Swiss-Prot record:
Pfam families: CobD_Cbib. GO terms for cellular component: plasma membrane. Pathway: Cofactor biosynthesis; adenosylcobalamin biosynthesis. The keyword Transmembrane helix applies. It is found in: Cell membrane. The lineage of its organism: Bacteria, Pseudomonadati, Pseudomonadota, Gammaproteobacteria, Enterobacterales. Converts cobyric acid to cobinamide by the addition of aminopropanol on the F carboxylic group. However, the true cosubstrate could be (R)-1-amino-2-propanol O-2-phosphate, leading to cobinamide phosphate. This is Cobalamin biosynthesis protein CbiB. It is a multi-pass membrane protein. Belongs to the CobD/CbiB family. Its main location: membrane.
Amino acid sequence: MTILAWCIAWVLDFIIGDPQHWPHPVRWIGRLITFVQRIVRRYCPGDKALRIGGGVMWVVVVGVTWGVAWGVLALAQRIHPWFGWSVEVWMIFTTLAGRSLARAAQEFERPLRENDLAESRIKLSWIVGRDTSQLQPAQINRAVVETVAENTVDGIIAPLFFLFLGGAPLAMAYKAVNTLDSMVGYKHEKYRAIGMVSARMDDVANYLPARLSWLLLGIAAGLCRLSDWRALRIGWRDRYNHSSPNCAWSEACVAGALGIQLGGPNNYFGERVDKPWIGDAQRGISVDDISRTIRLMWVASTLALALFIAARCGLSGVA
């Protein structure tokens, strides 16, 4: 039944994704973070106090998320096993973001093909932290491909990884870790102190999933009739060409599979950041690379699900 719940949740995400106006745990987690952050900022003046308060905030948000998820699931199972199973499917479904990521990326294909830079820049500003006001089509394509490649890890592979380790409650706790990083894990002045622990713990949580993504995306490249060997080679060579210890693993693998170059300099919050290049520019990046990256994401996602199901069955057999 547990494996069936995983499969149904994955299929639901593949087919419908997150309906825009449905209640979603990540929104509730976001409200909790905002509430706790307000308290921390009120009672923790100074950088040192904010770093400690940010650590307490991380423990509270992740702990509450895991505890509530575990409690709701336990209560639902006591009401009726089938009701508990349905709640488990729903919880797992909400931790996956493949369809939402694919939809967000596909939103750029039409305006880019029509050379509507104004619409493309506005839409890109909704999903990335860099300055998009002066970006050209190739830079927008690059940003979208990078977003899909990076979020293949924290939107699909990592939730499945923590689902395998600790069930739906641990997968929900991972979403809290990831949401904390998304909201406060920045290096600029406002969040540097309070978000330090959140940023570091997100790096820890994604350490193994990011490295697993290198292998899965490399295999996916071969299945998508792209260069699997080049994906794995470039993915390994450029795995540390990023300020994050995790992001370049998936981005470099995708860059290698497609034969394009990612990364490079960008403007963030008014400051130019010179990032190293990822991959080799064997050709110019194009709008078609967005759909190719989405395809890689889905194949890698399927491989991840199959891997964790096989591991679960193997462990059950040993037990």
